[in-house]
């Protein structure tokens, strides 16, 4: 399915978006009904867990999902969203179609029904979401070895860095100090996948104090 944009301006805020996602995940036909269980927004993408039940109370039979104990199945849907000339639009995809965007929170994944095929697109998508969630959020002063060298502008590379920050106005922004040069670089979360913590700042002396003492030796 392609993009669908709303030209009536009814979706303008986060609350509007969430309400529309809930509406899109709610449906009742002659045999089945679908309802939203949970929705989370990561960046501009909405991730939704939707539960399907049979109206007559019999267990839902599905080729992709294992039926839950209550007779329902719960699947994930991904909604790409953006604004174009002030109009909100979305493009949706069910997890079994293998969406590219794969940053659904673990709390949402925990609500989903088990999959019958371990080699399915949905299984691979869930694994990518889990891999993303496993990327650590490093603390100020943590020394890190990246899984592979990162190529910087100019052709140089870096692999061992220390988490720090810089300020833009009143905002603190995460960056990393390069071990070899002392220069600062911003790294995407994806580039931290598979990284190794070499030393932790927790319980250590202040980085500022440590630098001061090192200069006196």
Describe the function of each predicted region.
Residues 5-43:
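Negatively charged, low-complexity tracts enriched in Asp/Glu with abundant Ser/Thr
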Residues 11-12, 22, 46-48, 59, ...:
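Hydrophobic residues embedded in beta-strands of well-ordered beta-sheets
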Residues 86-132, 175-217:
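Intrinsically disordered, low-complexity, charged/polar segments
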């Amino acid at each position: 399915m392609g993009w669908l944009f709303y030209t009536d301006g009814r979706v303008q805020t986060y609350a509007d978006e969430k309400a529309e996602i809930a509406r899109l995940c709610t449906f009742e036909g002659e045999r089945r009904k679908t309802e939203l269980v949970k929705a989370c927004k990561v960046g501009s993408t909405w991730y939704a867990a939707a539960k399907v039940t049979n109206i007559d109370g019999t267990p839902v039979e599905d080729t992709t999902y294992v039926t839950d104990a209550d007779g329902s199945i719960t699947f994930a849907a991904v909604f790409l969203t953006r604004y174009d000339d002030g109009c909100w639009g979305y493009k949706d995809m069910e997890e079994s179609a293998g969406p590219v965007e794969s940053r659904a929170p673990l709390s949402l994944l925990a609500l989903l029904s088990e999959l019958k095929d371990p080699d399915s697109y949905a299984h691979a998508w869930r694994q990518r979401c889990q891999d993303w969630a496993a990327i650590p959020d490093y603390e100020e002063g943590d020394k890190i070895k990246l899984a592979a060298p990162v190529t910087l502008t100019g052709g140089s590379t870096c692999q061992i860095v220390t988490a720090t920050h810089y300020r833009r106005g009143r905002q603190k922004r995460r960056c990393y100090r390069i071990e070899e040069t002392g220069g600062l670089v911003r790294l995407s979360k994806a580039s931290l996948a598979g990284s190794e913590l070499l030393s932790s700042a927790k319980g250590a002396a202040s980085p500022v104090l440590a630098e001061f003492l090192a200069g006196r030796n």
